[in-house]
């Protein structure tokens, strides 16, 4: 019998092959947790990148991975029944604001049906704390900055945002009815090594290195609260051992809190491009384009709530974070893509 495995706290991380999920799983194993990770390894972007993230976790005997879809209620039910999880961090979701306009069903299946399966899993198999990913997109076209958790979130401007808003509503109902302790984290534009290829920083670096033109929407007059991955992981790790208590006053008995997790320092896209140019030592070709459907002008997180609860203090400035991403892209990601291209050429030869 493996005594160490039996005494370690067990955590389920959904979306473990994703950008945030893989970083979190690695951090949790190093902190002494027994981590079970699941992911459906879909083709929203290259599964090769997702597999490479998982490969970096394989050296830990305290990480187990299962390829499965959170929308599969039968498999999810068995997973929770057999897992004995102390805590759950739910990060699996169909991401992307613009992709949701053309592929709405993917968002319903993953972000709504999948989240319901997670809620049912913890209802039937109680755990100490369910932490789930919400999004800054729930603030919609809110023009009052910085965004605070008390601001209205009743007017989402994308299908993705609507699904994340629904997650918060379902979480409240389940916590109110069943006493499930939950924390929803509204992520603000996460970036860094092993990031998603559909995100702006990834696209901009790739375009500049390839000599392609960057599209800057709304004439480049958009700003985002870019948050480095290490700061995000630090925030999750800090909140994980702090399940909320039932409200002692008011109309809701839910053991639920919703918190922003961001950098608290928005960056305009024009400035972002300059920072990337400096990190690459190359100049970008830029095309100024109109506002995109479903986009918002700014995101800007107040992190006072998370700071008061955990001491959270995002530490990585945009210049340092971009430099780290560029180094990873040149060293690791380009090698990964070269391997993929070689394998493709070999298969058709």
Annotate each language-model stretch with its function:
Residues 166, 170, 174, 204, ...:
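Hydrophobic alpha-helix immediately C-terminal to the catalytic Tyr-X-X-X-Lys motif of short-chain
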Residues 194:
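Conserved GTPase G-domain signal focused on the G5
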Residues 1-190, 236, 240, 312, ...:
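N-terminal Rossmann-like NAD(P)+-binding domain of SDR-like oxidoreductases, especially those catalyzing
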Residues 24, 30, 208-349:
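C-terminal substrate-binding subdomain of Rossmann-fold SDR/epimerase-dehydratase oxidoreductases
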Residues 159, 167, 197, 269, ...:
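Conserved donor sugar-nucleotide recognition element shared by glycan-biosynthetic enzymes
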Residues 145-146, 197-205:
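A glycine/serine/threonine-rich, flexible loop-to-helix segment
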Residues 108-111, 160, 205, 262, ...:
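Amphipathic, non-transmembrane alpha-helical scaffold segments
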């Amino acid at each position: 019998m493996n005594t160490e495995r039996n005494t370690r706290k067990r955590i389920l991380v959904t979306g473990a092959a994703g950008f945030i999920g893989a970083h979190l799983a690695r951090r949790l194993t190093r902190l002494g947790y027994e981590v079970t990770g699941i992911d459906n390894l879909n083709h929203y972007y290259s599964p090769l990148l997702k597999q490479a993230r998982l490969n970096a976790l394989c050296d830990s005997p305290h990480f187990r991975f299962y390829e499965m879809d959170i929308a599969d209620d039968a498999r999810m039910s068995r997973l929770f029944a057999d897992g004995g999880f102390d805590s759950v961090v739910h990060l699996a979701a169909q991401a992307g604001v613009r992709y949701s306009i053309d592929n709405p069903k993917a968002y319903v299946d993953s972000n709504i049906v999948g989240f319901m399966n997670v809620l049912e899993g913890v209802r039937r198999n109680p755990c100490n704390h369910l932490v789930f990913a919400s999004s800054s997109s729930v603030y919609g076209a809110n023009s009052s900055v910085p965004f605070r958790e008390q601001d209205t979130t009743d007017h989402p401007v994308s299908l993705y945002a609507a699904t994340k808003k629904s997650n918060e509503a379902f979480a409240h109902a389940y916590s109110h009815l069943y006493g499930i302790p939950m924390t929803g984290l509204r992520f603000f534009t996460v970036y860094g090594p092993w990031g998603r290829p559909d995100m702006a920083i990834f696209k901009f670096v790739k375009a500049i290195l390839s000599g392609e033109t960057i599209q800057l929407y709304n004439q480049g007059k958009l700003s985002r609260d870019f948050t480095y991955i290490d700061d995000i992981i630090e925030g999750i790790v800090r909140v994980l051992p702090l399940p909320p208590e039932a409200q002692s006053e008011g109309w809701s008995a839910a053991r639920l809190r919703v918190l922003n997790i961001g950098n608290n320092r928005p960056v305009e896209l024009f400035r972002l491009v300059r920072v990337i140019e400096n990190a690459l030592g190359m100049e970008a070709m830029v095309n100024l384009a109109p506002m995109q459907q479903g986009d918002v002008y700014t995101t800007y997180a107040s992190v006072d709530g998370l700071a008061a609860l955990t001491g959270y203090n995002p530490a990585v400035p945009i210049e340092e974070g971009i430099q780290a991403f560029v180094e990873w892209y040149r060293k690791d990601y380009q090698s990964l893509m070269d391997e993929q291209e070689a394998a493709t050429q070999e298969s058709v030869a």
